[in-house]
Structures are given as C-alpha cells and as structure tokens.
Amino acid sequence: MESLIIKLVPFLKVLFAFVLMLAGMRFKVGLGLSILAGSLAMAFMFGLGPIQWAEAGAVALIQDKFIYLTAIVGLILILSDAMERAGQSKRLMESLSGFLTSPRLRLMFFPALIGLLPMPGGAVFSAPMVKTAAEGMTIKNRDMAVINYWFRHIWELFWPLYPGIILTVALADIQIIDLIAYTWPGTPIMLVAGWFFFLRPGVLDTKDLAMGPLPTTRSKSAAFKEGLPLLVAIVGAIGLEGAIAAFMPSIPFELGVIVALALSVVCVMVQNTQLGLKFLKDVLSKKSLWSMVFVIVAIFVFKDVMLAAGVVEEMARVAGGGAALFASAVFLPFLVGMVAGINVAFVGATFPLLLGILSSLGMQDQTIPYLVLATFAGFTGVMISPIHICFILTCQYFNCDLGRTWRKLVGPCLVFLLSGIGVFWFLV
C-alpha cells in the first residue's frame, strides 16, 4: 500500500496543479495568470524554487518555438480581423451557401478545412468563420467553441504533415504509411463522435439552426475570390512546409506557415483597399490580441517549468515493474498530453520509453499496435487538456466559461479513447 502511494505522489502533484489552474479560471483570475499559478505550484512541488521557476520561464520566452507561435497566432488574428472588418468572411459564407445547404455541415466545414493546415493555435483561425456560419442561429457560445475546437483536430492522427506523426515515425524508424495505415480510423471516429455529441438533432435542435432563405446559386468564381486569402494560407503553408522539408530541412517549418499567413494578409488588404494601413495600427492596439499573446507566454512558461522540474521523468521512474508497459503505452502518453496540450510533447517524452520497454521485452513485432494505442491515448489527453492552446484561444474568442465548455469534451474524448483501445485489440 505504501509503495502504491509513493508511486501516485507525482501524479497527485500534477493533478493538484491542474485543479489550481481550473480554480483560477473558474474564479475569473484570468487564463494566463491561472496557468502561471499552476506552473509555480508545480515548480515548488517538484523541487524548484522561485528563482529557478523564473529562470525556466525566461528561457521559455527566448525560444524560437515561442517566437514562431506568437507570430503565427498574431498573423491569424490580423487575417481573421481583416476578413471580418472588410465583410469578406460574410461574403465567403454567402458564396458557399449554395454548396453548404446543411446548417450542421456549415458549422463543421471551416474547422475541418483549417485542420488541414498544421499550425499551432489554428482553431482561432476558424473560430470567426464558425461565428459567421452561425449568424442567425440561436447557438450558445460554448457550443460554437466545442464545434470549432473538435472539428479543427479531426485530421491529426492521419494527415502526414502534422509534427506528431513525423516525430513518431522518426523515433520508431518506420515509414509514415506504416503508421497512418492504422491510425486513420481516428478521423472517422472523431467525425462520428463530434456529430453525436455536438451536432445531432436533440443536441442542436432544428429550431436553433433555423435561418433565413439561403442563396440557391453556386458561384465557383465568387467562392474562389472570397476564399483566396484562405487558399493562400493553406496551400501556401503546406507547399512551403513541403519545400522546406525537402530542400532546406534545417529551417523550421513554422517559417513557411508565417510567410503563407503574411501573404494571405497582404491578399486581403489588396482585395479590400479600404482597410488601409490604419487597420494594422488598430488591430495591433487591440486588447484581445495582447491577451492572446499573454496566454501563449503562460503556456510556454508552464511547458518549460514542467521540463525543468523533471515532471515526466519522475512519472516515468515510478511507473516500473509489471505496470511499465501499460503506463508507457496509455497512462503516461495520456497524462503528458493533458499536461502539455500538444502532440509533440507526449510523443517526444513517452515514446522513447515505450519503444525501450518493447525492446527489452522482446516485443518489437508489436511496435505498431502499441504505437497506435499510445497515439490514441496521448491525443485523448491533448484534446481533454485545459491548457491546449486551441481550446484556450477558442474559449477566449467566444468568451465562454472554460470549465463548462471543457465538460462537454469528456464524453467524446472517452469514446475516442475506447475506440483506440478497440483498434489496438484488433491489431494484436
């Protein structure tokens, strides 16, 4: 009994830090401050003093990844604000109305489309489009938030441009096709779960989706013109990422995303000359932009404090004995995914341990099934994470209560995890 309690100690510490963060969010302390408080509590519980906490936080804010993410989110907000202010988002929705006649399809279409663009914080890109698609409907903000958040991530276990997939195949020394040939069920599972929990009749009543008469014309040229900035962002980012990976692998892929987003902003301003340079000055002085930046600061501080305090290593150390394989394939990926809120974190932190255990047990022939199980478990943790940047930014955009919105994710995430276990048992 005593040894069990000792093994649970690091997990209970992490749980306490999360409870503290959620309490701060609940009592309107603010997202950024709540996450910083959680990082400080975690630092103290894992042996870091206030000076070490500050040093870890300072290191986080000079990393390339932080600078790139801040630039990406900033450009996304500028682009979405420009399209909204110029009325282009509304015109785009009107031009697509003849193609997207189902209100439910309209709500999920743009998050799913933007999900093909593997960029951090991408849910804030599609959030204004969901808001525009929902105009005239009587849908609660938290419902729009979960629809945007969930359908933005339906491709992450299948789309080969996502960094989590790329890192997994690099660590396991396998081909991408060997992995996604078994992880692809994650996409239809998320589609079905998203429809059942967020979109089906009974969850969203038909009367809530009632709208005025939709245009019956289908103008491909109008849709192309109004959607050109999005095409520049998506196709440009994917193309530049591919070019960088093929010809300049030493250059961070985020630079391709930044260039594509900057070009899409230029595209909007050329198409809508009335915006002018005054628009840029106005958007850069908006409080909402800098609130988002502060949240990103807090998330990066939390991530680096977690690394500096050796949180993952401590959890892995106590998960030994007969529980090691289960812990490394399910529990640790889930927990690290939930703590960090990004795929690369659970892959990089726990997959080397999992691969090492499989090797030590002579189970290399079971590598793919266990990687699939760990991927489903880790991604479930990422999706349920209250500090997932897409979740936080989406809730911030729709101005909805984070706790109440988070509770709506428990059901579909449980279904997703159980489905992943089912896929694993099928493979073994």
Show which residues each predicted segment covers.
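Membrane-core helix-loop-helix motifs of multi-pass transport proteins
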Residues: 137-229, 390-427
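Transmembrane alpha-helical core residues of multi-pass small-molecule transporters
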Residues: 38-42, 111, 151-152, 185-190, ...
